[in-house]
C-alpha cells in the first residue's frame, strides 16, 4: 500500500508515476479530497475531545465547590454527541480512503522502462545463445506424452483442463528439479521453510493479492453455505505465507537481510487466460514452484534485488539452459512491484523465450500493508522492504529441460547437475504404461 502522506505532499509526481501504471489522475484527486475531509474531521474531533476534558475538569471542580454544573453537563453531552458523529465520519472516510489505497499499485522505479505492456520490456543481458538442434524440435507436451512421463488426458478426466499427471521418470525429474533448487538456494544463504498452503484474507491482502485479484485464486467455501466463502484461500505462490510470516513483527535491523525459500504447490484460476497456452506446462491451474523471499532494510533493497536475480540466474546456468533477463515495463510489472526482472528461458520448439522467474523489489509496499518493521541501531522503527522471486517455477523448468535436452530419437538427456538427484539416470527413455 502506498503512503497517503507521500501522495498528498507530492500529488503531481504521484499522478505522473501512477499514470504509467494505468491509474487516472482523477483517482488520486478523489483520494486526496477524501483524505483532506478525513483529516479535518479528525482534527475537529480531537479539539472537541480536548474541550470535553477541560469542561469535565470544570464540572468536577464545580461539584467540589457545591456549585450548579447543570449547564456545563448539558453542554458536555452535546459535545459528546458531536464527537461520536465525527468519529463515525472519520471511520467512514478512512474506509473510503483505504478502499482506493488498497487498489493502487506500487510506484514504479525511475529505471523502469515506461510503456503500457510487455512490448516495452527491455533486455538487460543474455546468457548463452539459444539452443540449436539439427532436427525439428518437438514441443515438451509431445515429448512428455510420447515418453509416457506426462499425461494430460487422464488429468483432464480426473480434474479438468490445465492439470497433468507426472509419471515415472517425469515424476522423478520434477522432484529432482525442486530438490536441486532448494539445495542451491540454501547454499546461497536462504533458510528453507515449509509453509501452510491455505492462508487467510488478511495474508492475501498483506501481499497484495486481495482485494484487487480475488478472481485469480481459489477460495475455500463453507460446505453449509456454498455462497459464503471461508476465510481461507489456496496460495497462488509461496510468497504469500513467506512474507506474512513476518506480518505485524518488529525485526532487529542487525539481523537483516532475512532470506527464506520454500517449495510449494501454487493454485491459480488463470482468469483472463482463455485460449492462451492451452497445451503443456506453461500455464496450469496447479503447479509446483520454489520461491525466494528477502526481508531487507530500505537502504539495501536495490542491491538485494540484484542478488536475488543472480540467485535465480545461477540455477538456470547450473542446468545449462539459455535465458535472458528482461526489465519489465511500468505497464507489465506486477501490482506490488517497484521493479521486476523477468528471467525467460529459451524454448526451442516455440522458438522464443518464456518466463520462468520474476524477481521483484516491492520496496515498502507490502510491509506497509502487513506492518513489517525493523528497529535500526538507534532504536528508530522503519518499514522493511520485501523482495520475492521464483527460484524457479518447477513445471516450466521441466518443460525447458525436455525441449532443450531432447534427442532426435525422442529420448531426453538429463542435465549433469540433476543426475545425482535422479539415481544416476543420464537419459530419459519411454516409460511403460500402467497395466498395458
UniProtKB/Swiss-Prot annotation:
This is Serine--tRNA ligase. It comes from Lactobacillus johnsonii (strain CNCM I-12250 / La1 / NCC 533). Its EC number is 6.1.1.11. Residues 43-55 have a biased composition (Basic and acidic residues). It is found in: Cytoplasm. Homodimer. The tRNA molecule binds across the dimer. It is an enzyme of class 6 (ligase). The keyword ATP-binding applies.
